[in-house]
């Protein structure tokens, strides 16, 4: 009977697979009987007045309005009054298509104010020029998971002036399908790198200032996790800001997205129109203050998410908290940032944002924050952050982006400020509505953060971030290094490994107050002695690991230090060895040879440590003394003058 049940189960799976919609690409690529794209009904939009829009934008900029990149064109298009239906050759699917064109648009996006997709169906939006072997990242797909109580769907941008809207529906469910297109949004600025390339010929580019710093640059090292929390987004297909996923005390990965109240997302209709662009960042580090940094980037806008509901909003501290409609896509590898609601200032701050809603950038401040009211007057609702001359700034489009403490916790979201690449002195600063103020907000769940970010009322003052629950967890790297010395100079070789990625950055501390980020640095010490050296490595997933070792340098002629920094575990009642290879020496050892020993162990009185030469001579260093004290971190001096160079000490056991 088990075999029979198995056969029935396989049959059921086979039927289910046969009724699933085709792959996420235009149906005509898989069904030759469907009309070619050039035969699909075309609707051309009325001309838009771009000159008027740009004149309006000058006034919008003066008022500090959030950036506009598109003009909305009102339409009323449904499958009942537009486009045409066809059936796939196998008779299983009905396919409805409509081409839409708006002359000179740099990109298009669409607002559907009545959307319902039955199970097994899908909606595609793609460039009219899409080819079977073309970039699949330009195709946006929506299905039943995008159904929502507002019955709205707003799409990601499609580069170019002409796009195809395509619905593929199981034939027996066509009656359930609902679609009403009411907004065609004409991009006249250049939203995204592909649209900006189309704009380049006319000199229009929606790029950010050259002083900004790409998140892939070294300034992002150690912050790779919080970088993944930040996304750019569009509102109603025409305006744009920045926001961030935030964690809550339940650690349940609710899709809470924090942004600015002034971005206008505080109503049900505008919240439903959000389209978030995740991991939209340049692939290389463009040196700040170079032409490349101020030019078009290469960030991908293929990782998108549509729709949300409002949880809370409060004008005084300029926050809006949304809950995005859909769970995180594991492939996006998102991060939920922690937060800090304490009533205090901080010694510095970090901003991650989308200036001009272009590729993601990072700004750093090493100046203490201060309390201000919005606009810079006396008050405590906002944090004032002073940017360094070379630490990046924010720009229009950065609004709503998070400001982080040095511990990588959200302290607030960007309200605004005078900062820009050309700003100097105190004008190179910004103001952020504080999480502290927003926590109690206006005194009700709809105007404060506490109900949502601390649902069980734990009273937590701060929490750390939470990584994605999907995909393959990032395995932390293993830090390791070796060293050699010559006189007062030590040369270090990084031998760290990362099993599921690569080492992205290194931070050395040489034990005398000096540091380095080089891969294999050399260090010349001012005086002879033994120094504790630490290496902290960060992998490409943001995980870190630290290795601590020691190095002994001597000012004497020809002095050389040999080490073995490989960690060795010490089991109970066991003998272990840590071999040290000595080569390239002549003559005998010194009568005052220093031997640095570093052993981390509870109760040093349990330990016996010997130095054993290759000829078997044993030099005792430590013999079960020290009582209840822990660890042996000590330099011993031994007379090794009887040891010839080729018979130098071989191991420490």
UniProtKB/Swiss-Prot annotation:
Subcellular location: Secreted
EC numbers: 3.4.21.50
Post-translational modification: Three disulfide bonds are present.
Gene Ontology CC entries for this record: extracellular region
Catalytic activity: Preferential cleavage: Lys-|-Xaa, including Lys-|-Pro
GO MF term set: serine-type endopeptidase activity
Annotated P/Homo B domain residues: 555-653
Disulfides per UniProt: 211-421, 217-285, 241-263
Pfam family, one: P_proprotein
Maturation propeptide residues: 21-205, 474-653
Signal peptide: 1-20
Principal localisation: secreted
InterPro entries named among the record's database cross-references: Galactose-bd-like_sf, Ig-like_fold, Lysyl_endo-pept, P_dom, Peptidase_S1_PA, Peptidase_S1_PA_chymotrypsin, PKD/Chitinase_dom, PKD_dom
Domain PKD: 474-553
Family according to the record: Belongs to the peptidase S1 family.
Protein's name according to its UniProt entry: Protease 1
Organism listed in the record: Achromobacter lyticus
